[in-house]
């Protein structure tokens, strides 16, 4: 197994050759004295001595979001080849290998709705993606629980289904009683992620799980638009790759003071769920994320009723009418100039 991985140091290829599971977990040491643990298919941990941060970089929770997969695979390859040397402990997760092979967002169910125990509710552990979500939760728990003093960070990397007026943006999970981190917002801005959405309620996303369970600085990070493998312009992700490499390989990053002029800040005003099969948006199917609508405009109709804009202006992200009844169809946003940011 080790020889298979180290021949090309291509962890993605190794994962896709073993999409369901590995025969056994194993570990080895690099010449730079970094310990490498392969816990499962798509799960690899690098542990140097004297780390002060525990970092989770996850990708492919949706299998067709290829740019984050390519970014993570290159970082893993560079660590395995020792082109770069880890100074911080980092776990990479390739979330849904079978969906990658299928070239689809998911096989049976949207995995980013299955965390914080949602995998075992309703129909229970009824298909592989629910089992995988449960396993990923446990790997994150094992990783973070190994240290109590280190800073905990989780960037769950995605690309969006549709184009966006702000190409790169992040969702800051709901964290009652905890201020938002200006340092983290500025780090993401340096990654090219210049737009932040502050969520208003608990969710069942991967980033919320890490934030809520382990008080991690956790984010869902959207890096652009979904493209097939081989069609990503990786120059558009150069800032992200550079900053993630710095995060892993530097003992301490120079702090950057929060500057609201460098970022676009929104908060979620409401989440609109689907209640009837006839749910239909009133705007064009190719409307970009962050398209804005004025108070009184009709956003959608369902069950004979109109859903209208409630604020002077609301922007929308992640519109998707083709979800099961009870699930979210869209997030509505308003400007957030006064959030508690330290």
From Swiss-Prot:
Q: What is its EC number?
A: 3.5.1.96
The cofactor named in the record is:
Zn(2+)
Q: What catalytic activity is recorded?
A: N-succinyl-L-glutamate + H2O = L-glutamate + succinate
InterPro entries annotated for this entry?
AspA/AstE_fam, AstE_AspA_cat, Aste_AspA_hybrid_dom, SuccinylGlu_desuccinylase
CDD domains, A to Z: M14_ASTE
Q: Name one GO biological process term.
A: arginine catabolic process to glutamate
Involved pathway(s): Amino-acid degradation; L-arginine degradation via AST pathway; L-glutamate and succinate from L-arginine: step 5/5
Q: How and how many cofactors are bound, per the record note?
A: Binds 1 zinc ion per subunit.
* Signal peptide boundaries: none
Could you name the active-site residues? 222
Residues reported to bind Zn(2+): 62, 65, 158
- Keywords assigned: Arginine metabolism, Hydrolase, Metal-binding, Zinc
**Example GO molecular function:** hydrolase activity, acting on ester bonds
Q: What is the enzyme's main class?
A: hydrolase
Q: What does this protein do?
A: Transforms N(2)-succinylglutamate into succinate and glutamate.
What protein family does this chain belong to?
Belongs to the AspA/AstE family. Succinylglutamate desuccinylase subfamily.
Which PANTHER family does UniProt cross-reference here? ASPARTOACYLASE (PTHR15162), SUCCINYLGLUTAMATE DESUCCINYLASE (PTHR15162:SF7)
Q: Extract the NCBIfam families matched here.
A: arg_catab_astE, PRK05324.1
- Protein's name in the database: Succinylglutamate desuccinylase
- Source organism of this protein record: Shewanella frigidimarina (strain NCIMB 400)
The gene name reads astE
